Amino acid sequence: MVAEGESRGGAAAEPSALDDETVFIEPRWPIALPLASYIAITIVLRIVEPERETLGPDWLVPSIEIGLLFALIAANPAHLVGRARWLRPLAITLIGLLAVVAMVANVILITDLVKGSKVTQSATSLLASGAIIWLGNALIFGLLYWELDSGGPLARYRRDRAHPDVAFSQQLDPELAPEGWRPVYVDYLILGITTSTAFSPTDVMPMSPWAKLMMAVQSLVSLTVIGLVIARAVNAFT
């Protein structure tokens, strides 16, 4: 009997030829850990500063975040991925909701900075708010890149698409990585952080229109938040 993942000649089967019952081995803790940490920080910040304006009731955003955490852990876990296919649309929907929440949080912060509020009068509270929003933007955009690039984690594993939506250095120059290299969540998290920090692509190039637009939006939001928060914080300290 031929072993799973091997041809009759003993060579490993190509990922594109694998069926829906293929074992997907990307670990979930690199995804769960930063998201769980972000959820904990936002909850603690809400408890410490209850006067902070948020979108909807206090339980709304944490509920969406916790739901996303469970969906991402369950979708394409380290077992038969074909059985969890329906969870990916749920994960994308929850990430989209978080992206909307993040954009609203950016608008609220910018409005508070322009009009003034109790939170923005304190340099410490202002910097904490800015840091949380910046971190949330980087994390959420990283999740979006991870779920949308080349059809998602499973499609990348199976190499269903010939051309990526975002091209990493290892894909542009195969000599920089082992044979069969594929980006995992940590690569997309770093992409989200560097785009929010450098306000432009660094070692990862957007190839498709949606990726270019998403990076442009992320850079503009990050630039606006950082610029206004730092300017207001300097005034609050002086």
Positions of PLM-derived features:
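Pore domain of cation channels
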Residues: 182-238
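Cytosolic-side membrane-entry/anchor segment at the start of a transmembrane helix
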Residues: 70-117, 122
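Structural signature of hydrophobic alpha-helical transmembrane segments
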Residues: 56-70
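Pore-domain transmembrane helices of cation channels
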Residues: 115-154
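N-terminal membrane topogenic signal
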Residues: 21-34
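Membrane-proximal soluble regions of multi-pass membrane proteins
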Residues: 150-203
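Short, hydrophobic transmembrane alpha-helix segments
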Residues: 45-58
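Short, Lys/Arg-rich, polar N-terminal cytosolic tail immediately upstream
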Residues: 1-24
